[in-house]
């Protein structure tokens, strides 16, 4: 049985938000690096850097908070396609989150990208998660 790295990212960020932790450490894989790159581009996290301990490589994410109440920019995140149930979408039916306010992260034949980029390139793929 394998690990669901995308669910690990989402859960780690959610748990860090609950305890108001500024940084999160996740295991670095090609998939997690691409998802972190998208979260960084879209402004959901403040910074991401690589950290190495022995043979293992980690990504250290700095969460982005707003206001005095220290609310994170990620209000809701949900894993859509799971290892036991894959969910795919063609290029015409790529979903939008909150009318474009959130981001859908897809895995396509041209790599992991956002819903906007997939619509622009007119390609579909596996819907990995929603972030708003």
From Swiss-Prot:
GO cellular component labels: chloroplast; ribonucleoprotein complex; ribosome
Taxonomy, superkingdom: Eukaryota
Keyword field: Chloroplast, Plastid, Ribonucleoprotein, Ribosomal protein, RNA-binding, rRNA-binding
GO MF: rRNA binding; structural constituent of ribosome
GO BP terms, alphabetized: translation
SUPFAM superfamilies hit by this protein: Ribosomal protein S8 (SSF56047)
Localization per Swiss-Prot or TrEMBL: Plastid, Chloroplast
Keyword Ribonucleoprotein among record annotations: yes
A Pfam family the protein falls into: Ribosomal_S8
Signal peptide: none
Family in the record: Belongs to the universal ribosomal protein uS8 family.
Self-association state and partner proteins as the record states: Part of the 30S ribosomal subunit.
Function: One of the primary rRNA binding proteins, it binds directly to 16S rRNA central domain where it helps coordinate assembly of the platform of the 30S subunit.
Name of the protein described by the UniProt record: Small ribosomal subunit protein uS8c
UniProt lineage: Eukaryota, Viridiplantae, Streptophyta, Embryophyta, Tracheophyta
UniProt gene name: rps8
């Amino acid at each position: 049985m394998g690990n669901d790295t995308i669910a690990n990212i989402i859960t780690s960020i959610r748990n860090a938000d609950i305890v108001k932790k500024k940084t999160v450490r996740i295991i670095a894989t090609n998939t997690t690096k691409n998802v972190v790159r998208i979260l960084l581009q879209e402004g959901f996290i403040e910074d991401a850097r690589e950290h190495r301990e022995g043979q293992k490589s980690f990504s250290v994410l700095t969460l982005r908070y707003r206001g005095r109440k220290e609310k994170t920019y990620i209000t809701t995140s949900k894993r859509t396609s799971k290892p036991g149930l894959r969910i795919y979408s063609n290029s015409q039916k790529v979903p939008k989150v909150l009318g474009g306010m959130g981001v859908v992260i897809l895995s396509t034949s041209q790599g992991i990208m956002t819903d906007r980029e997939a619509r622009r390139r007119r390609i579909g793929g596996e819907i990995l998660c929603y972030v708003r």
